[in-house]
Amino acid sequence: MEGFKRYVEVGRVVLVTKGEYTGKLAVIVDIVDHKRALIDSPCSEFPRQVIRYGSVVLTHIVMKLPRGARSGIVAKKWKAQDVCNKWASSAWAKKLEAKKVRSQLNDFDRFAVMRLKKQRREQVNVAVAKALKA
């Protein structure tokens, strides 16, 4: 049995899921209590603030950061450790981006996607039939 992999810790990068800054990345700078943490984000225009753990999701990215680091230090470490690019290259970020693109499709675009999926499914079925026949 495997335990938790994502712990609430200083330097853990989080994704905000509720409130005004939904979808923004931030990093835990300090732990206030068992329900709240101080977060800061140099990547997006996002003020340093205390936020509830229920309003964020912990990501797999952890920065090396001293406890209670000020915004300037956080910004330097953020750039040095290339957090924005690590996030952008993750499957999670790609899935969120795809979901956003899919939600903005109009009716004709959804129809075109359906046709392409049908074509792909047909090609797969033909290939499987050939493989079984051979």
From Swiss-Prot:
One of its GO terms (cellular component) is cytosolic large ribosomal subunit. Keywords: Cytoplasm, Nucleus, Ribonucleoprotein, Ribosomal protein. InterPro entries: KOW, Rib_uL2_dom2, Ribosomal_eL14, Ribosomal_eL14_dom, Translation_prot_SH3-like_sf. CDD domains: eL14 (cd23702). It comes from the Eukaryota. GO terms for molecular function: RNA binding; structural constituent of ribosome. It is found in: Cytoplasm; Nucleus. It holds the Pfam family Ribosomal_L14e. Component of the large ribosomal subunit (LSU). Mature yeast ribosomes consist of a small (40S) and a large (60S) subunit. The 40S small subunit contains 1 molecule of ribosomal RNA (18S rRNA) and at least 33 different proteins. The large 60S subunit contains 3 rRNA molecules (25S, 5.8S and 5S rRNA) and at least 46 different proteins. Belongs to the eukaryotic ribosomal protein eL14 family. This is Large ribosomal subunit protein eL14.
